[in-house]
Curated annotation (Swiss-Prot):
Residues 191-276, 279-361 form the RCK C-terminal domain. It is a multi-pass membrane protein. GO terms for molecular function: monoatomic cation transmembrane transporter activity. GO terms for cellular component: plasma membrane. It comes from Shigella flexneri serotype 5b (strain 8401). This is Putative transport protein YidE. Its main location: membrane. Pfam families: Asp-Al_Ex (PF06826), TrkA_C (PF02080). InterPro entries: AAE_transporter (IPR050144), RCK_C (IPR006037), RCK_C_sf (IPR036721), Transpt_YidE_put (IPR023018), YidE_YbjL (IPR006512). PROSITE patterns: RCK_C. It is found in: Cell membrane. The chain crosses the membrane at residues 4-24, 28-48, 65-85, 95-115, 158-178, 371-391, 393-413, 439-459, 464-484, 493-513, 533-553. Belongs to the AAE transporter (TC 2.A.81) family. YidE subfamily.
Amino acid sequence: MSDIALTVSILALVAVVGLFIGNVKFRGIGLGIGGVLFGGIIVGHFVSQAGMTLSSDMLHVIQEFGLILFVYTIGIQVGPGFFASLRVSGLRLNLFAVLIVIIGGLVTAILHKLFDIPLPVVLGIFSGAVTNTPALGAGQQILRDLGTPMEMVDQMGMSYAMAYPFGICGILFTMWMLRVIFRVNVETEAQQHESSRTNAGALIKTINIRVENPNRHDLAIKDVPILNGDKIICSRLKREETLKVPSPDTIIQLGDLLHLVGQPADLHNAQLVIGQEVDTSLSTKGTDLRVERVVVTNENVLGKRIRDLHFKERYDVVISRLNRAGVELVASGDISLQFGDILNLVGRPSAIDAVANVLGNAQQKLQQVQMLPVFIGIGLGVLLGSIPVFVPGFPAALKLGLAGGPLIMALILGRIGSIGKLYWFMPPSANLALRELGIVLFLSIVGLKSGGDFVNTLVNGEGLSWIGYGALITAVPLITVGILARMLAKMNYLTMCGMLAGSMTDPPALAFANNLHPTSGAAALSYATVYPLVMFLRIITPQLLAVLFWSIG
């Protein structure tokens, strides 16, 4: 059997064993995708015992490509909602994540001094305990720059391998323990997150109000200050028994009923200056109007602002709201359309059909993947991650690496949406498939590399001590911050799990958190919110610790 065939066969075996382990559940809790790591350790042990040798270069390429696929698809998924989330809750989430990094560094320093753990070993334990491969590489590089013998530098890799599996378990255990301590109902948490999903802080709502302010009588909608901006859309007007689609020039009169779409605070202000909310229905049933959801798939309208399409003037159709990657937005005229945007249209059937033709509304296109933007995004992400950042006083340049670069680039491209006819929308099913493939490849290789010497180090060496130290570095910061976040900040459980996973830059933990409620994007969003800053901190922390410990002896 050729080397390639052998490697692929071993990887397939690891995936089968690992996914089987991950599907085994105890009281509803399982390792999920994290089981692949243990499958790799098991298979790696027997591969080593059998004397088989796999190409280290090939394994390294597969491992890094798997990681790139995973973080890139995560970024594309959460990109559209990432920056809105950052404005609303990003500061709080990042503060908690930074606190986890700081506490982890303090625990590492205390263990190093108390138990006189060799510097390469403690840095490897730290990197494995926080499940951060770039931290391992950064630590090894700084040790080489400081003149540490190669045999000592290699110890960092072994201690990393010992701490890494239990680092993942520690994160999963912390999530499970916090769920038990606070008696969390995951379904309730998902509903609460969905009800509080925001765009600049508020969920989009609709109300019907009656024009009661005499100062608004016989005014055009565009002359009413609260209605002439982009914060509120007036999508329907009912006068006596006639329902119509209003335009900015439509004159409103006392007694008219207006159907308004906007954020709660803005709608409240509208009531103050126009009139009170009423229970009267402004349904289109039984009228010559209808409401329909249409998806943007026509490449010719991508990047164009809603106001520039002149749907009201040309077709007498109003866009009442816009859904982008699950985030509800007020359809203001300045919003540029992206592929996959879902628009609520109000108008006559023939007019809506005409607008749908302009927008595309080709459902089959939503199932197609444009591969060119995928590889452009991955390539740009790798380039971004390879840019060295020179910090005064550091003997080695800092980099985002193959994990941070593609993630940040994907977040940016996901937010931009499209450039010309290139669009970075990815069907959810395709995104999930690439994401799962990437994480399976990554964990399979990590497990295989750890499996050969894992048992010997565990039984005959200092492996148990290293695991214990790693468990402390993993658990103490996570449990401390998890309790603080839940008790003091009243943080949503799913959001907290994503933050904990992101603070450890741990894809398997994110996969586990996502599986707690597959239809909620809370964990992925908070993960991506803290990941960029934490990745940078995780890369420089072992370098800071190395320089600190080296200088004080």
